[in-house]
């Protein structure tokens, strides 16, 4: 396996309602809502937006609920499982491995001119998406799950 599975991400039309219903029906507890400015390159070009999301608390793999953004990379279209996420030690190498195995690069995180930065997405034509996340981000992420602030 290229990395360690840690999350399944779902795009939802209304984040607050999704949190409420998931907590009520499944007893899942979530982090506070995180709002994070994000810049990424997609097949449509560079997208810059504020991403709103939560992660389930407890042991991984986590459930990530992402508030949909119409007409963008996270278009809600009724809510769906968006991706599985893997921690990787070498983002560029793992991304090249997926691309070389027939799973093309779909989007990559950016930090100004630095690309890829923090994460990339690869996708198969039938819908499976894999998010590779640089393991350098893991300590910050785990501190956030423990009640700290998330800085991407």
Predicted segments, located by residue:
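Short, solvent-exposed coil/turn segments
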Residues: 5, 49, 79, 115-117
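Vicinal oxygen chelate
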Residues: 5-13, 55-57, 75-92
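Extracellular/lumenal glycan-associated surfaces
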Residues: 7, 21, 136
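A short, polar/proline- and glycine-enriched secondary-structure boundary/capping micro-motif
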Residues: 73-79, 141-145
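Acidic/histidine-enriched, glycine/proline-rich intrinsically disordered or flexible terminal extensions
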Residues: 134-152
